[in-house]
A protein has these predicted regions:
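Conserved C-terminal RecA-like helicase domain
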Residues: 1-120, 127-136, 143-150, 160-167
Length: 167
């Protein structure tokens, strides 16, 4: 835990964020906790992690390499987190979305990171049900059985700017 804390602290030391640094620091650990839940639960094969900012290489507020480091600590380097974690951003969005759907349909376990603005309203992230899961599904209603499924789990990081305060 100390190694993780120190690594995040070093990555944020160059950021002149003041009070925002506390938020950025906590965002790293909230995201790592979401990944930890994904990693610990075998029944979670697809996890959508929605943040307010895309993690990018060498970004002083949310560096993807720092997240990879935290995720490697969680997995104890038992897997290549760069193959398990997918970034769904605006650059090549349709190709990335298609690739993610294909991997999930093939039964791969994926942790997908995106932001609210990229996914946007009306985007359908469902994917074809993997064969390994199809036979274990139980239909609980009279709706037509679908060949698509949603993500198994989702994490929403402080979606405060998406809702309107009416009081």
């Amino acid at each position: 835990a100390k190694a993780a804390y120190d690594h995040v602290e070093r990555s944020l030391s160059s950021a002149d964020g003041g009070e925002d640094n506390k938020y950025n620091h906590q965002r790293y650990f909230r995201t790592a906790l979401a990944f930890k839940k994904f990693w610990e639960h075998e029944d979670i094969r697809s996890f959508l992690c929605m943040l307010n900012k895309h993690p990018k290489r060498n970004d002083k507020f949310l560096d993807i390499n720092v997240l990879y480091y935290l995720f490697e600590l969680i997995t104890e380097r038992l897997c290549d987190v760069r193959k398990t974690v997918c970034l769904l951003d605006g650059e090549g969005y349709d190709d990335k979305k298609s690739d993610i759907a294909k991997k999930l349909t093939n039964g791969e376990k994926l942790f997908v990171i995106s932001v609210y603005q990229t996914i946007g309203a009306g985007q359908n992230l469902q994917y074809d049900i993997p064969d390994a899961v199809r036979d274990s599904l139980i239909q609980t209603n009279s709706w037509n059985r679908s060949t698509k499924k949603d993500f198994d789990a989702i994490y929403l990081d402080l979606p405060t700017n998406l809702t309107v305060n009416i009081w």
